C-alpha cells in the first residue's frame, strides 16, 4: 500500500509543478483590444521586454505589447456597499442580513496605454486582490514607468 501511494505521489507532483501558470489572470474591462469583450478572462505574462496577453479560454494570443511602447500605467479601486443584497437577505433572515450592508467589496483595476509606432491603444483590466500589487510592480519594473493613482486624478465637485 505504501509503495502504491509513493508511486502515485511521484507521478502526481511533477505533473502539478509543470501545470502551474507563471502569469497573472486578469479580467478585461474595456478598451482597444481586438476581439475582446468586457468580462473576458485574460492571461498576463510579463517578459523581459514585452507584455503578453492571451485569452484564458483557448489560449489564443490577444496582444503582445513591447514594454518600451507603454506610455502610462494607472491603477484604481472600485468600492461598493452591498445594500441591495443586504435588504434581500435581511427580509429572509429577520434582520441578520443587515450586517452584509457593512461590508465593502473592492475591485482593483490597472490601466495601460501604449503607442507603438503609429498604433495607439489602451485598456483597463481588473486584477485579483492577491495579484494586484504584483501586476503593478511587474509592469513598473519592465517599463520603467511609475503607476499613477487614477483615484487621485479624479476631480470631485
Q: Can you annotate each of these PLM segments?
A:
Residues 25, 50-54, 110-114:
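Short polybasic amphipathic segments
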Residues 1-6:
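Positively charged n-region of N-terminal signal peptides that target proteins for export
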Residues 20-22, 69-157:
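Acidic, Ser/Thr- and proline-rich intrinsically disordered linker/docking segments
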Residues 17-50:
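Anionic N-terminal interaction surfaces
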Residues 37-39, 56-60, 115-120:
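Glycine-centered tight beta-turn/hairpin loop motif at sheet-sheet or coil-to-beta transitions
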Residues 10, 35, 44, 101-103, ...:
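Sterically constrained small-residue positions within well-ordered secondary structures
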Residues 8-15:
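Bacterial N-terminal signal peptides
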Amino acid at each position: 500500500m505504501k509503495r502504491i501511494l509513493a508511486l502515485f505521489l511521484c507521478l502526481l507532483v511533477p505533473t502539478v509543478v509543470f501545470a502551474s501558470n507563471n502569469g497573472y489572470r486578469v479580467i478585461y474591462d474595456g478598451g482597444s483590444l481586438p476581439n475582446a469583450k468586457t468580462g473576458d478572462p485574460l492571461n498576463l505574462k510579463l517578459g523581459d521586454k514585452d507584455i503578453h496577453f492571451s485569452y484564458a479560454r483557448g489560449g489564443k494570443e490577444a496582444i503582445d505589447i513591447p514594454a518600451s511602447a507603454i506610455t502610462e500605467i494607472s491603477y484604481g479601486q472600485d468600492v461598493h456597499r452591498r445594500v441591495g443584497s443586504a435588504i434581500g437577505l435581511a427580509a429572509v433572515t429577520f434582520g441578520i442580513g443587515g450586517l452584509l450592508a457593512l461590508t465593502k467589496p473592492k475591485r482593483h483595476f490597472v490601466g495601460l496605454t501604449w503607442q507603438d509606432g503609429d498604433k495607439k491603444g489602451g485598456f483597463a483590466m481588473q486584477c485579483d486582490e492577491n495579484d494586484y500589487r504584483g501586476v503593478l510592480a511587474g509592469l513598473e519594473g519592465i517599463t520603467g514607468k511609475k503607476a499613477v493613482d487614477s483615484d487621485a486624478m479624479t476631480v470631485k465637485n
